[in-house]
């Protein structure tokens, strides 16, 4: 049967539960176990798809089209398992399903309550997501003590009672601050968060202590005594330069031995050779490139988490220190298109996004890259922006724009597609008045690349599969005009619509843009061919 590891957090949020959980998963996977991961989000939103990036950060898209928490991106980068919509659910989804059952009469007129109906639905979803795996690591979002988390914590308490200690393990992440004025490490916050857990029936088996320095032996003994946890199960999670150092850091403290003993897992020794190579490559680069990322969410870089990591992965596989400079597209717009800050950059990237704010600043950045032969990579909106700039400045389509920004523009080269065929053959429709949630082209889609194109050379294939998240498409009515002006359509969707998927410029050192999100499938072990090619282009531009 599947063994469960439940990861919770206390004291404050943003301690790195996702990284800790993913690191444990990576270690267990290296010991030969088939591991999956789940993220349980206590918010009432159905999913993060319509949440502001400033509040929630990046929305990570799975292969099957689920819009999920960015932690699922960490999961896929740390382990080989591919996440699906079963690996993530929220309070909103739980209540939505329970209420739907009540409306259908599934509860036979009974009073629907948090216990047992909500907790039963949570447990059902956990078991569904974990089915078929040796170990499932379940991260509970939020902080112990938050009212929103209580049904989830009660559900995992019940699972411990039902499955037993040898099939479940509680790992609790706590903050252990260092007070500089006193010159002391303080364990009281950890004592209080464990007390909070005990009050709801949860006893941590492992305490992972987030610290900015190594934990002294006496403090470890103190935490073990007051929190009723074995001393060897008090594990330090220290600040590191790269998150990819975390698996080795936790393994060196024996966390996997504690887990395998309690869960009675008879497995091989851990082999972290691959992780050691990754860390060595990060710490010993031979080259340096500077890449400008021009967007509107630059004040919260978590909005571009997978993209940042994908560039780092490309750095690993090209022995390059990729230095990212975030450029606010609104500031370019407000300064009459001043792009002087881009002159020292080796390459320019415009990522995805929504809304009209900062668009003209992004267009100015694309124009600079095209006219000055600077390597350019556009992703999702970044492709649409590149196409709008080309339509205006090269193809002569005055008033070219997207209907997302100007519904009555003279040349809608990017528009809302109202009907398309999904990967399973069904037809979906949408219009301008449709709800924002659930009206996007989502998940992995087949893409056909033109023989001899830059796209085909980068991927080494004419058939690829990449993940999407967008509502607006290139208007195919304008494609002939754009192609006559020299634009190359390097890739189109495999469906009957033949939607534009990639564009490139033949008379430019390296100019490529795609409608899909390749960053969602990059990982440190393999990287991604598109980002590797982009970093190589930046290196070539630097040498030139």
From Swiss-Prot:
Which SUPFAM superfamilies does the record cross-reference, listed alphabetically?
Class I glutamine amidotransferase-like (SSF52317), P-loop containing nucleoside triphosphate hydrolases (SSF52540)
Reaction(s) the record says it catalyses: UTP + L-glutamine + ATP + H2O = CTP + L-glutamate + ADP + phosphate + 2 H(+); L-glutamine + H2O = L-glutamate + NH4(+); UTP + NH4(+) + ATP = CTP + ADP + phosphate + 2 H(+)
Q: Does the keyword Magnesium apply?
A: yes
Organism's domain of life?
A: Bacteria
Q: Name one GO biological process term.
A: 'de novo' CTP biosynthetic process
Which residues are Mg(2+)-binding?
A: 71, 139
The keyword Amino-acid biosynthesis belongs to this UniProt entry's keyword annotation: no
Alphabetical UniProt keywords:
ATP-binding, Glutamine amidotransferase, Ligase, Magnesium, Metal-binding, Nucleotide-binding, Pyrimidine biosynthesis
Part of which pathway? Pyrimidine metabolism; CTP biosynthesis via de novo pathway; CTP from UDP: step 2/2
The miscellaneous annotation reads: CTPSs have evolved a hybrid strategy for distinguishing between UTP and CTP. The overlapping regions of the product feedback inhibitory and substrate sites recognize a common feature in both compounds, the triphosphate moiety. To differentiate isosteric substrate and product pyrimidine rings, an additional pocket far from the expected kinase/ligase catalytic site, specifically recognizes the cytosine and ribose portions of the product inhibitor.
This chain belongs to which protein, by name? CTP synthase
């Amino acid at each position: 049967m599947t063994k469960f590891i439940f990861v919770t957090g206390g004291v404050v949020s943003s301690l790195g539960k996702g990284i800790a959980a993913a690191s444990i998963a990576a270690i267990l996977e290296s010991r030969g176990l088939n591991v999956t991961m789940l993220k349980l989000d206590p918010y009432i939103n159905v999913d993060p798809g319509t949440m502001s990036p400033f509040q929630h950060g990046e929305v990570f898209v799975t292969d099957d089209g689920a819009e999920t928490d960015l932690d699922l991106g960490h999961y896929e980068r740390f382990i080989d398992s591919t996440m699906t919509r079963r690996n993530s659910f929220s309070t909103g989804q739980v209540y939505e399903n329970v209420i739907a059952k009540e409306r259908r009469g599934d509860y036979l007129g009974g009073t629907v309550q948090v216990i047992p109906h909500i907790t039963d639905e949570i447990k059902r979803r956990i078991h569904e997501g974990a089915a078929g795996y040796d170990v499932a690591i379940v991260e509970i979002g939020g902080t112990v003590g938050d009212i929103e988390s209580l049904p989830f914590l009660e559900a995992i308490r019940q699972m411990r009672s039902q499955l037993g200690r040898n099939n479940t393990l509680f790992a609790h992440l706590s903050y252990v601050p260092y007070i500089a004025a006193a010159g002391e490490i303080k364990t009281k916050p950890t004592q209080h968060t464990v007390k909070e857990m005990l009050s709801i029936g949860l006893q941590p088996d492992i305490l992972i202590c987030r610290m900015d320095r190594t934990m002294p032996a006496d403090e470890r003994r103190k935490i073990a005594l007051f929190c009723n946890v074995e001393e060897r199960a008090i594990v330090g999670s220290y600040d590191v330069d790269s998150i990819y150092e975390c698996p080795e850091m936790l393994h060196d403290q024996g966390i996997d031995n504690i887990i395998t003993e309690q869960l009675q897992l008879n497995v091989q020794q851990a082999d972290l050779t691959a992780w050691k190579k990754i860390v060595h490559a990060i710490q010993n680069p031979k080259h340096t490139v500077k890449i400008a990322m021009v967007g509107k969410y630059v004040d919260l870089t978590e909005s571009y988490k997978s993209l940042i990591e994908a560039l780092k992965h490309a750095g690993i596989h090209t022995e390059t220190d990729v230095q990212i400079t975030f450029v606010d597209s609104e500031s370019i717009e407000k300064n009459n298109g001043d792009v002087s800050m881009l002159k020292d950059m080796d390459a320019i990237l415009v990522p995805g996004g929504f809304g009209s704010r900062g668009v003209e600043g992004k267009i100015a950045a694309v124009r600079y890259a095209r006219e000055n032969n600077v390597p350019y990579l556009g992703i999702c909106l970044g492709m649409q922006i590149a196409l709008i700039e080309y339509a205006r400045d090269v193809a002569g389509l005055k008033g070219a724009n997207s209907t997302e920004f100007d519904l009555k523009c003279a040349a809608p080269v990017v528009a809302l597609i109202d009907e398309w065929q999904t990967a399973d053959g069904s037809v979906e429709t949408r219009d301008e008045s449709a709800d924002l949630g659930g009206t996007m082209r989502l998940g992995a889609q087949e893409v056909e690349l033109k023989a001899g194109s830059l796209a085909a050379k980068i991927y080494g294939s004419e058939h690829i599969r990449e993940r999407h998240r967008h509502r607006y498409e290139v208007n195919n009515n304008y494609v002939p005009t754009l192609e006559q002006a020299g634009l190359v359509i390097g890739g189109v969707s495999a469906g009957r619509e033949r939607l534009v998927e990639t564009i490139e410029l033949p008379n430019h050192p390296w100019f490529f843009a795609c409608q899909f999100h390749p960053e969602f499938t990059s990982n440190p072990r393999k990287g991604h061919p598109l980002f590797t090619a982009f970093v190589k282009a930046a290196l070539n531009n630097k040498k030139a």
